């Protein structure tokens, strides 16, 4: 699948790009980043020639929270744990970067600066490993594919995507977008 990144659409270019690529057929859209405004996609639909189907990922996410409260509570606990990890990481990163700047001011360049930068990279790597570990533990304990509500939504999203000639992801809240894209297995 070809990817075309358009950026902000203050002056819409989507219709022009769709025409120039020869796009024909149904287009799946994701407006989950708009959150409660997800269904307000008439302008987007118009730009696509009304040949679109909104995957309604935000609505599906809300449905999972309502119909599978245990999963939703576990997901909130994960979000809180990841938030705490992020807060501690940012605190540590701030001091590590201050050390880099201090070494640069004192030593200019050379091995001391390289070592300070390496310490920042090690901190980044450790943070990514810890987040990966938290997520892996969550998905092992709460396997989304085994949750009936999620599995049903995943199947419907897969069906809609299988009939689509293209996928358009509108902007919005990046955290909500990544969460819903992952939960409903859009990349599969």
Regions found by a protein language model. Name each.
Residues 174-184:
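Glycine/threonine-rich flexible loop motifs
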Residues 1-168, 173-176:
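Extended, subdomain-level signal for the structured scaffold at the beginning of enzyme domains
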Residues 186-188:
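Short alpha-beta junction capping motif
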